[in-house]
UniProtKB/Swiss-Prot annotation:
<feature type="binding site" description="type 3 copper site">
    <location>
        <position position="534"/>
    </location>
    <ligand>
        <name>Cu cation 2</name>
    </ligand>
</feature>
<comment type="similarity">
    <text>Belongs to the multicopper oxidase family.</text>
</comment>
<keyword id="KW-0964">Secreted</keyword>
<dbReference type="InterPro" id="IPR033138">
    <property type="entry name" value="Cu_oxidase_CS"/>
</dbReference>
<feature type="domain" description="Plastocyanin-like 3">
    <location>
        <begin position="417"/>
        <end position="553"/>
    </location>
</feature>
<feature type="binding site" description="type 1 copper site">
    <location>
        <position position="538"/>
    </location>
    <ligand>
        <name>Cu cation 4</name>
    </ligand>
</feature>
<feature type="domain" description="Plastocyanin-like 1">
    <location>
        <begin position="37"/>
        <end position="153"/>
    </location>
</feature>
<feature type="glycosylation site" description="N-linked (GlcNAc...) asparagine">
    <location>
        <position position="319"/>
    </location>
</feature>
<comment type="function">
    <text>Lignin degradation and detoxification of lignin-derived products.</text>
</comment>
<feature type="glycosylation site" description="N-linked (GlcNAc...) asparagine">
    <location>
        <position position="444"/>
    </location>
</feature>
<dbReference type="Pfam" id="PF07731">
    <property type="entry name" value="Cu-oxidase_2"/>
</dbReference>
<feature type="glycosylation site" description="N-linked (GlcNAc...) asparagine">
    <location>
        <position position="303"/>
    </location>
</feature>
<feature type="glycosylation site" description="N-linked (GlcNAc...) asparagine">
    <location>
        <position position="438"/>
    </location>
</feature>
<feature type="binding site" description="type 1 copper site">
    <location>
        <position position="543"/>
    </location>
    <ligand>
        <name>Cu cation 4</name>
    </ligand>
</feature>
<keyword id="KW-0325">Glycoprotein</keyword>
<feature type="binding site" description="type 2 copper site">
    <location>
        <position position="475"/>
    </location>
    <ligand>
        <name>Cu cation 1</name>
    </ligand>
</feature>
<dbReference type="GO" id="GO:0046274">
    <property type="term" value="P:lignin catabolic process"/>
</dbReference>
């Protein structure tokens, strides 16, 4: 590249970023309209051409951009043979629970040939979020970024970056993911690992037939860049790093944090993280790498990293790419180190006087096979059927909209008896019952727990070792929560240390392998909200429950009527 080309590219990069900011930087709230056509395309990856489900024929899907307090209206048209819904991960949906998106929880799926219009405000929210399908495992390819910028008069609480880029970390399967989920359910065994990791849909040169399938960012030397990281994967937690560059975390799950600088980060599925990177190295090409964090034992997983390029403008074509170094796949210390560094930017109002205490165990189960065909043997441990649970209750997905049943006071579809503590107390991590499949059974049910509006809630999530303990990404719809503590082993109220001054405010928490995590939040959003593990396989197996927040005394504290075009089951 000639020296005269460098300033031209410099000006172009800055101009594009400025136009993007100007486009959303108007004064006052706006209404932003989008149309999502859910449709299949033929896509070639890893030496094979397969049919995948996309939005607007894009993989990854289109970006949604808005400004704090804007209204977003998205008409979703389902042009595929599969049912679908869209969830707006991290958007609280204040008084708009009907548009949250999880299938059979807040709505019936959008059936083939049908449409549904989502309509909600991003009230008092800004930052990096994610939209994705919330039916079966379709979010393997149906996902994209949802970026909410601060109001025009509100600056970032850090130095304004020269430019920004969105980095979507994904998993790619060559098989049809809807059929794959069905096969896993029928077999009772574990799922196969993804065929590749991807960065913005590209696997990079470590995979077959992928030497040219490499995402690349053009970087101006000595400038500061904001990278919006999103883990859109469905069954894997992942590390991310850039060769020879330091990453400064400034936001997680749409909430500002105190700046924390590290060499690598780990994101659980559904988590978002904004990082600042300074282009302070010698002009050249540097690897951005994504690789697995797998804390469970005896689990098959994809262990080939995805690679993208962080390329300085002015680098020569024959420059050797500087390789990035990822942690080993089970580096629990690297994960804890990053988590220890997360603090809310300012002092926060953590609930002190708690109205409801919950203790929820999370883990895997092995149920008896109970195959209808005696010749078909289940492929779980000791020929059992793998399951998952919260407080040993394995969630059974209904075939109606639970929110609609709750609103219309229909009986027989769910119960209000989800236990606030496990039935039995034992050494959850080390002494779990493991006589498969006699004492690893889970009870089945579609159960919820009810909170009064404004209740102050504390939940202890306790990892269990019934089969294997691992880092579980637990996501709460409709609310964010303060992560006030976490640790290894069994939770002990006498020794647990809580941060009540500046804990991070998240919507998805990785409950540590062989450990526990404590959260607090105020139940101030009326409706019915899903709590679940964000590994799709664990949600498929039943690691979910539901929180019902009752109406308050005022109209603005109450769930509105359902929309007229709400899909039918």
């Amino acid at each position: 590249m000639t020296s005269s080309a460098v300033p031209s590219l410099f000006r172009l990069s800055f101009l594009l970023f400025t136009l993007q900011v100007m486009n959303i930087g108007r004064i006052g709230a706006a209404t932003r309209f989008y149309q999502f056509k859910v449709q299949t395309i033929r896509l070639t990856r890893l030496c094979q051409t397969n049919e995948i489900v996309t939005v607007n024929k894009k993989f990854p899907g289109p970006a949604i951009s808005a400004q704090e307090d804007d209204r977003i209206v998205i008409k979703v048209i389902n042009m595929t043979p599969y049912n679908t819904t869209i969830h707006w991960h991290g958007i609280k949906q204040k008084r708009s629970c009907w548009y949250d998106g999880p299938s059979y929880i807040t709505q019936c799926p959008i059936q083939s040939g049908q449409s549904f219009t989502y309509n909600f405000k991003v009230a008092q929210q800004k930052g990096t979020f994610l939209w994705h399908a919330h039916f079966s495992w379709l979010r393997a390819t149906v996902y994209g970024p949802l970026i909410v910028y601060p109001k025009a008069s509100v600056p970032y609480p850090f130095k304004k970056p020269f430019n920004e880029h969105t980095i979507l970390l994904g998993e790619y399967w060559l098989k049809n993911v809807v059929e794959l989920e069905q096969h896993v359910l029928e077999s009772g065994g574990p799922p196969p690992p993804a065929d590749a990791f991807t960065i913005n849909g590209q696997p990079g040169p470590n995979y077959n037939c992928s030497s040219k399938d490499v995402y690349e960012i053009q970087i101006v030397p000595r400038k500061i860049y904001l990278l919006r990281l999103i883990n859109a994967g469905i069954n894997m937690e992942t590390f991310f790093t850039i060769a020879n560059h330091r990453l400064t975390i400034v936001e997680v799950d749409g909430e500002y944090t105190k700046p924390y600088t590290t060499e690598r980060v780990m994101l659980v599925p559904g988590q978002t993280m904004n990082i600042l990177v300074t282009a302070d190295q010698t002009v050249g090409r540097y690897s951005m790498a994504m690789g697995p964090y797998e804390s469970a034992k005896n689990v098959k997983f994809q262990n080939t990293s995805a690679i993208a390029n962080f390329q300085y403008i002015g680098a020569l074509p024959n420059n050797v790419t500087v390789p990035a170094k990822l942690p080993i796949f089970n580096d629990n210390i690297a994960v804890k180190t990053v988590m220890d560094g997360l603090r809310s930017l300012n002092a926060v109002d953590v609930p002190r006087n708690i109205d409801a205490h919950l203790f929820i165990t999370i883990g895997l189960n092995v149920n008896k096979c109970n195959s209808e065909n005696p010749n078909n043997k289940c492929q779980g441990p000791r020929k059992g059927r793998l399951a998952a649970s919260m407080n040993n209750i394995s969630f059974i997905e209904p075939k109606v909209s639970i929110l609609e049943a709750y609103y219309k006071q229909l009986e027989g579809y769910f119960t209000l008896d989800f236990p606030t503590t496990p039935e039995k107390a034992y050494d959850f991590v080390n002494g779990a019952p493991n006589d498969i499949a006699n004492d690893t059974q889970a009870a089945n049910g579609t159960r919820a727990i009810v909170f009064e509006y404004g209740s102050r809630i504390q939940i202890i999530f306790q990892n269990t070792g019934t089969l294997t303990t691992e880092n579980h990404p637990i996501h709460l719809h409709g609310h964010s929560f303060y992560v006030i503590g976490y640790g290894t082993g069994n939770y002990d109220q006498q020794t647990a240390k809580f941060n009540l001054e500046d804990p991070p405010y998240l919507n998805t928490i990785g409950v540590p392998v062989g450990g526990w995590a404590a959260i607090r939040f105020v139940a101030n959003n009326p409706g019915l909200w899903l709590l679940h593990c964000h590994f799709d396989i664990h949600q498929t197996w039943g690691m979910s429950t539901m929180f019902i927040v009752k109406n308050g005394k005022k109209v603005q504290e109450s769930l509105p009527h359902p929309p007229a075009d709400l899909p039918k089951c």
